């Protein structure tokens, strides 16, 4: 969507893996974590000088972008593999191919799988075409030579380091990964998908089964913090601010909305000053 392309920015985190098994475990867990992380770090309620009523308008814009190439890959199935991910890319409608310094528009008329079989107006598929197709696939978590986690609003100060600290604490510690998998074991794909759709409006107050996102968020932070302490990384200090927000059931967006509709009197200069103070 134009809003997503022109008006939004986010923080991405990249995770290494050592084997297909390791990659798929981290990939599935990152997908399950993603709506909770989006809720925790929601920080984009203002658009065009107006309180949108959403905690993360960036998150909303992604819900209204091409659903063929966005969201979760492969319904987070337990059997998901490298081959399955490639199959998702292959079955995604194509946007364009690049030939002789020109873009040839395909406008979603064919999938990459169909392009390989049938070509397009005399053009045949190349490895470069596949690489472009993979780059134009925008799931919550993208698989490259690393795992690219893509679902966080821009935040400032220690909050941006908190995103990294949480993933470091969980993804590089088998015990922490075990605990997260246990935390999510009663949730199905539809639960994560419904939460993803509810988070832009409600952030941590969104419901998931018989709980709220905030209940899971608190546990996620605890698991990451225990891991960082156990491994003596010295990174737990980066969690202090997000812990404070989460304990109150708040995201950064809640503070912005309160001030915007209160003492800031909807003054963009005060919003900009506040955001600058966070960096």
Positions of PLM-derived features:
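Substrate-recognition/cap regions that form aromatic- and gly/pro-loop-enriched pockets
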Residues: 146-235
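Acidic, mature catalytic/reactive cores of soluble proteins
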Residues: 106-118, 135-136, 143, 147, ...
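Loop-rich catalytic cores of soluble enzymes, especially ATP-dependent carboxylate-amine ligases
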Residues: 1-142
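Mature, function-bearing regions of proteins
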Residues: 1, 5, 166, 243-245
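C-terminal amphipathic alpha-helical interaction region
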Residues: 224-279
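Amphipathic alpha-helical surface "interface" segments used
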Residues: 53-60, 190, 242-253
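Intrinsic-disorder-associated interaction segments
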Residues: 78-82, 105, 120-123, 127-130, ...
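An exposure/low-complexity boundary signal
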Residues: 75-97, 211-239
């Amino acid at each position: 969507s134009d809003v997503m392309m022109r008006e939004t920015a986010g923080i991405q985190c990249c995770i290494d893996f050592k084997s297909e098994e390791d990659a798929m475990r981290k990939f599935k867990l990152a997908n399950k974590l993603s709506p909770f992380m989006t809720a925790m770090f929601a920080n984009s309620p203002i658009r065009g000088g107006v309180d949108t009523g959403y905690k993360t308008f960036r998150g909303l814009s992604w819900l209204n972008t091409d659903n063929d190439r966005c969201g979760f890959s492969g319904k987070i199935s337990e059997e998901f593999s490298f081959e399955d991910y490639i199959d998702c890319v292959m079955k995604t409608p194509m946007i364009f191919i690049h030939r002789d310094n020109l873009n040839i528009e395909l406008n979603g008329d064919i999938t990459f799988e169909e392009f390989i079989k049938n070509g397009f107006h005399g053009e045949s598929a190349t490895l470069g075409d596949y690489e472009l197709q993979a780059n134009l696939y925008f799931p919550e978590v993208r698989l490259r030579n690393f795992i690219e986690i893509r679902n966080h609003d821009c935040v400032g100060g220690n909050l941006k380091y908190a995103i990294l600290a949480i993933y470091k604490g969980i993804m590089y510690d088998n015990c922490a990964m075990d605990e997260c998998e246990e935390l999510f074991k009663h949730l199905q794909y539809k639960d994560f998908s419904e939460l993803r759709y509810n988070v832009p409006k409600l952030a941590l107050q969104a419901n998931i089964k018989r709980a709220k996102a905030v209940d899971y968020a608190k546990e996620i932070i605890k698991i990451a913090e225990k891991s960082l302490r156990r491994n003596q990384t010295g990174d737990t200090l980066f969690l202090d601010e997000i812990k404070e927000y989460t304990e109150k059931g708040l995201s950064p967006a809640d503070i912005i909305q309160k001030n915007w509709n209160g003492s800031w009197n909807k003054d963009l200069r005060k919003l900009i000053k506040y955001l600058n103070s966070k960096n």
